[in-house]
Regions:
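Active-site cofactor/cluster-binding pocket
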Residues: 1-191
Length: 191
């Protein structure tokens, strides 16, 4: 049964958080969700500066396009952003915090009433050569961790969304990043 998901993305300019938000919305639509929105948060961001985006997916029509304030999923593309309180602000009890890091969820010592999933998306993307202008693009890889943790969309729907989003020459490498990150994702569920 499909559930409502309100997802907030945190990354740095150039990592692809906004693109990831849009790809997830497309995959959810292909999965059969009736309501999908993806909204970037714009400010004075520049390459390397903190950025955020929001995705809403629902079996019903979504009429809201504002930023997500009380997410049930927070995705962090750069683990160094965890030092900022607003990253986990509003994360609902029992929700998911998904972090791109080499560390196991228990090692993050975050406390909180939420589940944690971690994966070294940076390592996966570096090994595959998903690097542009010196920045490792972890946006597609972290989608593998999202799928593993939430099961909100299937790998098949994500593959279709990737094929619609990227040119043929970029599809295979991005699908490999998603699949590899899915496999290495470590999960610590709230007890």
């Amino acid at each position: 049964m499909q559930e409502d998901y309100e997802i907030r993305w945190h990354g740095r300019g150039g990592q692809g958080a906004i693109t990831a938000a849009k790809i997830l919305a497309q995959a959810a639509y292909l999965e059969g969700y009736q309501g999908v929105t993806a909204a970037p948060s714009f400010g004075a961001e520049r390459r390397g500066a903190p950025v955020s985006a929001s995705t809403r997916i629902s079996p019903e029509t979504v009429m809201v396009v504002s930023q997500v304030e009380n997410p049930n999923v927070v995705v962090v593309l750069d683990h160094t952003l965890l030092k900022f309180e607003e990253v986990t602000s509003g994360l609902v009890k029992g929700g998911w915090l998904i972090v791109n890091t080499k560390r196991h969820p228990k090692e993050l010592n975050l406390g909180g009433d939420f589940n944690i999933a971690t994966a070294d998306a940076t390592g996966v993307c570096s090994s595959l050569g998903l690097v542009v202008a010196g920045l490792t693009l972890v946006n597609t890889a972290i989608l593998g961790a999202f799928i593993r943790a939430t099961e909100a969309v299937s790998m098949a729907s994500m593959e279709k969304a990737i094929m619609e989003r990227f040119s043929k020459s970029k599809v295979d490498i991005n699908l490999a990043a998603i699949a590899q990150t899915y496999e290495i994702t470590e999960i610590e569920k709230l007890k």
